[in-house]
């Protein structure tokens, strides 16, 4: 395996994004706005999650032409999404030269039984999780970066908060366990015990964990950092707002200075309307993207 395919290198690449904001973009123009605002990376896709949710049907990997246009337009890392379990979409993205692949529940799953074996790839993967069981399974498969699933395309932060709090609470529990308790907890979580042992030894996840799913305002981003996120993904929140350029800059600043409440108050002034949100409680079970994956 090439040196760039090792866990150490791939996880190190993800560590370099800590404290930053990664923004969804659908074309080169949006990618330039994101880079100018201070995004540490962009996620190239055909439609933002809000539009995927509204359109329904099957959501797939973006057209390679769109991804290549975004890659040519910016100097920051470019990520792209593959469907859960779709090995070939992931190989296509790797062949295009993207910097990260997101095996994403935002797209329609291709496999309802298996995720991609990410250790076969040189390019690092990011995956979503709702709890430590999901996080540990994705790490065992080779994920180099995690993010909360939240509820994408809603502009509602409540599920991202729930997922971040749950993962962190379960980490604290694991750290305090004895070896025999750890084995039982691995069974309860459906998690590989080797991953839980590494979490116990480190006192944290062995990979970075960003917040994602419903972040729409500078205050939302700061809240997720306050709860322990290593950084923030913003999907629909930027380009579904009234003023994408202002929102992008404000969210980047709020993420970097999440404990400076006077600054966040200043950043929040005169931004215009945030994206229109959806009450997650109103969604039918089949409309909840966070349920995808296992």
Curated annotation (Swiss-Prot):
The UniProt entry's GO biological process terms, in alphabetical order, are: amino acid metabolic process; pyridoxal phosphate biosynthetic process; pyridoxine biosynthetic process
Cross-referenced PANTHER family: PYRIDOXAL 5'-PHOSPHATE SYNTHASE SUBUNIT SNZ1-RELATED
Encoding gene per record: pdxS
Q: Which residues bind D-glyceraldehyde 3-phosphate?
A: 165
Q: Does the keyword Lyase apply?
A: yes
Protein's name in the database: Pyridoxal 5'-phosphate synthase subunit PdxS
Active site residues per record: 81
Q: Pathway, per Swiss-Prot/TrEMBL? A: Cofactor biosynthesis; pyridoxal 5'-phosphate biosynthesis
